[in-house]
Regions:
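Bacterial N-terminal signal peptides
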Residues: 9-17
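Sec/Tat signal peptide C-region and signal peptidase I cleavage site
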Residues: 18-22
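Metal-dependent amide/peptide-bond hydrolase catalytic core
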Residues: 23-31, 38, 55-56, 223, ...
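Active-site metal-coordination/substrate-binding segment of hydrolases
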Residues: 107-173, 179, 194, 407, ...
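Acidic-glycine-rich active-site phosphate/pyrophosphate-binding loop
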Residues: 118-132, 215-226, 361
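Acidic/histidine-rich catalytic neighborhood of metal-dependent amide-processing enzymes
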Residues: 144-219, 275-285, 435
C-alpha cells in the first residue's frame, strides 16, 4: 500500500548512478550485481505476466494465480513453499509462504523476513501491462508486483552466485494487504509467526533512489452515529426541537479539526457521510443512502472515516479527544463513536535506523545515491507494521513508480534492477551480521 510523494523525478536508467561514487564491493557482491543484470529481461517478462493477471483483493482466483506464478519462481530456487489458506469466512485468498536456510548460514547470523503482497487495489481489467521505452503501466506495476519481482530477482542473483547458501530467509507475500481480512489476528497469523522466527524484516513496497522507510503511521477506522429529533424545520434550534443530527455532526467534525489537526503525524478524515430521516449504511462497502425533505429536521446521520498516527500513544490520545467531543451534545441530539483497530503504526527505532545505515552504505557502494529516512507522513499503512513490534524492520525497498491506487499506475523499469541489486547486497550483509544475544522487544 503506497502513499508517498515522489522525492526524485528521474528517468532511472542513467541519472541515479551519477549521484554518489561507488565505494567497495566484494568480489561476490560484484558477481551478484552482474547476475541481476543478466536476469533483468526475464524479470520484466515475469512482471508483465503477473500484472496481466487481475488480482484485486476480492478476486480470490486472481490472487492465487499471481501467487502461483511467484511460487514457481521460488520453487526453482530451492525454497520450501506453501499456500497458507485462510478460513472461508474471511473472504480472502490466503498468502504465499516460502522458506530457505542456506547450508553455509552462520549460526547467530541475522535471519531475514521478506514481505510483499499479491493483491492490488484495482481489479486490473483495462489496466493490462503496457510498455513505452523504460516506463511500464498497469495495475500493480508499482504497488506492488514490481516489488515482488524485484525481490525474486534479488534472490535469483543470490542463488546463481552461491550467496544464497549463506542466508536464512522467509518470504511472505500476503493476498490481502490492500484490504486485510478480519479478524487481523487470523489474517496476519502467518506473518507474525514468520516474524517470531526472524531478526530483520525487509518490506518491498515501492521506493525510490534516495529514501527508505523506517517508520509508518498506523491506520484505523471510526464510525460516528448521530441522532436528532425529527420535526418541522421551522422549529429548529428551539427548545423541544433541538439542532438536528446534521448540525450536531457538523459541530463534532469541526471540533475534531480544531483540536486535532495541528498534531504532527496525526491525520483523520471523514470519508463518507449520510444523513437525513431515512438512512441506510454498509460499513464494509463504505456506502449508503439517505432520504429526507428540506423542511424536516434530520434525525439520523452516520460518518465513517480513518485515523492515522505514528505511535500507539498518539492514537490513544486522539481517540480520547474524539470521545470527549462526541460526549457533549447540542440540545436535542445524541452521538456515539466506535473505533476499529486496523493497521498498527511502525514507530522509528534505533534498530530500524541501524538497518537504514547498512542500506545507505549498500546503495553508495553500488554507485547509487545515499539513502535517508522517508518522513512517515508520506507513507501509508502496510504489512511491515504488524511485525515492527517484534523485529527490526525497513520498508520501501521496491521499485520506483507512480500513480499507485490510480488508473495511471506505472513503474520506471530500470528501478527494478536498482531495487534488486540493493536488496541482494543488503540481504548478504545483514545475514553476516550477528544478531544480539538479547532483545528489548
Amino acid at each position: 500500500m503506497i502513499s508517498r510523494h515522489r522525492v526524485l523525478v528521474l528517468g532511472l536508467g542513467v541519472s541515479v548512478v551519477t549521484t554518489a561514487p561507488a565505494q567497495t564491493l566484494s568480489p561476490l557482491e560484484t558477481r551478484i550485481k552482474a547476475a541481476v543484470a543478466a536476469n533483468y529481461d526475464s524479470a520484466v517478462r515475469l512482471l508483465q505476466r503477473t500484472v496481466n493477471i487481475g488480482s484485486g483483493t476480492l478476486n480470490l482466483a486472481g490472487v492465487r494465480g499471481v501467487g502461483q506464478a511467484y511460487r514457481q519462481e521460488l520453487d526453482k530456487l530451492g525454497f520450501t513453499t506453501r499456500w497458507a489458506s485462510l478460513p472461508a469466512a474471511l473472504g480472502r485468498a490466503g498468502h504465499l509462504v516460502a522458506e530457505w536456510r542456506g547450508p553455509r548460514f552462520a549460526t547467530g547470523g541475522k535471519r531475514l523476513l521478506l514481505i510483499g503482497h499479491l493483491d492490488t487495489v484495482f481489479e486490473g481489467q483495462g489496466q493490462r501491462f503496457t510498455r513505452q521505452d523504460s516506463v511500464a503501466r498497469g495495475a500493480g506495476t508499482a504497488d506492488m508486483k514490481g516489488g515482488d519481482v524485484a525481490m525474486i530477482l534479488a534472490l535469483k542473483a543470490l542463488k546463481q552466485t552461491g550467496a544464497l547458501d549463506q542466508i536464512q530467509v522467509i518470504v511472505i507475500m500476503t493476498g490481502d494487504e490492500e484490504s486485510a481480512g478480519r479478524p487481523l489476528t487470523v489474517s496476519r497469523k502467518d506473518l507474525l509467526d514468520a516474524a517470531r522466527k526472524s531478526d530483520v524484516a525487509l518490506g518491498f513496497e515501492g521506493g525510490d533512489a534516495r529514501t527508505a522507510t523506517i517508520a509508518r503511521r498506523g491506520a484505523s477506522g471510526w464510525i460516528l452515529t448521530v441522532k436528532g429529533r425529527q420535526g418541522h424545520s421551522s422549529a429548529i434550534f428551539r427548545e423541544g426541537a433541538g439542532y438536528g443530527a446534521i448540525f450536531e455532526a457538523a459541530r463534532i467534525l469541526n471540533e475534531f479539526r480544531e483540536r486535532l489537526s495541528t498534531q504532527p503525524y496525526l491525520t483523520f478524515n471523514p470519508g463518507t457521510i449520510v444523513g437525513g430521516t431515512d438512512v441506510s449504511f454498509d460499513s464494509t462497502a463504505v456506502s449508503g443512502t439517505a432520504a429526507s425533505k428540506t423542511n424536516i429536521i434530520a434525525k439520523h446521520l452516520i460518518v465513517q472515516g480513518d485515523l492515522r498516527s505514528l505511535t500507539p500513544g498518539q492514537l490513544d490520545s486522539a481517540r480520547a479527544v474524539m470521545k470527549a467531543v462526541v460526549a457533549t451534545n447540542l440540545p436535542g441530539t445524541t452521538a456515539t463513536i466506535s473505533f476499529d483497530d486496523g493497521y498498527p503504526s511502525m514507530p522509528p527505532t534505533d534498530g530500524n535506523r541501524a538497518i537504514l545505515s547498512v542500506f545507505d552504505q549498500v546503495s553508495r557502494d553500488l554507485g547509487y545515491p545515499a539513502i535517508e529516512a522517508l518522513p512517515p507522513e508520506r507513507r501509508g499503512a502496510g504489512d511491515v507494521s504488524f511485525v515492527a513490534p517484534i523485529i527490526d524492520a525497513i520498508d520501501g525497498l521496491g521499485v520506483d513508480g507512480f500513480g499507485a491506487h490510480a488508473p495511471e499506475e506505472g513503474v520506471y523499469l530500470p528501478s527494478l534492477k536498482m531495487a534488486a541489486e540493493r536488496a541482494a547486497v543488503l540481504m548478504l550483509r545483514l545475514s553476516r551480521a550477528p544478531r544480539p544475544a538479547t532483545s528489548d522487544r
